[in-house]
From Swiss-Prot:
Domain of life: Bacteria
Assigned protein family: Belongs to the UreE family.
Keyword set includes Chaperone: yes
NCBIfam families per record: PRK13262.1 (NF009761)
Keywords from the named record: Chaperone, Cytoplasm, Nickel, Nickel insertion
Name of the protein in question: Urease accessory protein UreE
Length: 231
């Protein structure tokens, strides 16, 4: 196993490394969005190199990171991250609304997203929601809940990633594929529960620790009553 403890540079962001590796052969380490949020993991590259990633805590890999370079063979190990697409909801037009309208719309949007158990990050007057179901289903949820007046679009996750802090990226992309993918399309008035936004956080574990067969409980507060969920 080849131990990787430092990132040498980034071929997409660093012009020095871009020039240095312009004629190099890339041996890709392909990671999904959850793997990319781990500072420690073990995985093989496309050419079969057994790589042990052991970075400082809170350091995460980015698309294009250079992990190793053999100058003699001109082969570089480079990270390729496959991220989910993201629904981007533009809230800018709400600035022209009255305070009451703004608060009401934001509250109802939070209810609609939370009712789907969709993760979300709000930044730059936009809401970023990683896709966990087909775009047609997410489009249906937005329109059924009456948010067609809010512009929204679907973009590549790689386009959003540079706008996020590490913690925001971990929330948005870390384990989004494990989110419940059920979809409720009823009007908010028809939903008897869920008056608040639920964002199910990320469980981050070191190597060798997993959620296997054990259960754990967590609670949500809904207005004036509480209830527990068992996983």
């Amino acid at each position: 196993m080849i131990l990787i403890e430092h990132i040498l540079g980034n071929v997409k962001k660093d012009p020095v490394w871009r020039e240095k590796l312009k004629d190099a052969t890339f041996d890709l380490l392909i990671l999904d969005q959850r793997e990319a949020q781990k500072s420690r993991c073990r995985k093989s590259s496309t050419q079969g190199l057994d790589l042990g990633i052991s970075l400082d805590r809170n350091v995460v890999l980015a698309d294009g990171d250079v992990l190793a370079w053999d100058e003699e063979t001109n082969v570089a190990v480079v990270v390729q991250i496959n991220l989910r697409d993201v629904m981007v909801i533009d809230l800018s037009e709400l600035k022209s609304r009255s305070p009451d309208e703004l608060i009401k719309t934001c509250f109802e949007l939070g209810h609609a997203l939370g009712n789907q158990h969709w993760k979300a990050v709000t930044k730059h007057n936009e809401v970023y929601v990683p896709l966990t179901v087909a775009t047609t289903m997410m489009d249906s949820v937005m329109r059924t809940h009456g948010f067609q007046h809010l512009p929204f679009r679907f973009v590549k996750g790689a386009e959003i990633l540079p706008l996020l802090t590490n913690s925001e990226a971990r929330l948005l992309f870390g384990g989004a594929e494990d989110t419940d993918t059920h979809v409720h399309v009823a009007s908010p008035l028809d939903e008897p529960h869920g008056s608040g936004l639920h964002i199910h956080g990320i469980h981050s574990h070191e190597e060798g620790h997993s959620h296997g067969d054990h259960d754990h409980d967590h609670s949500h507060s809904h207005g004036d009553h509480d209830h527990d969920h068992k996983h």
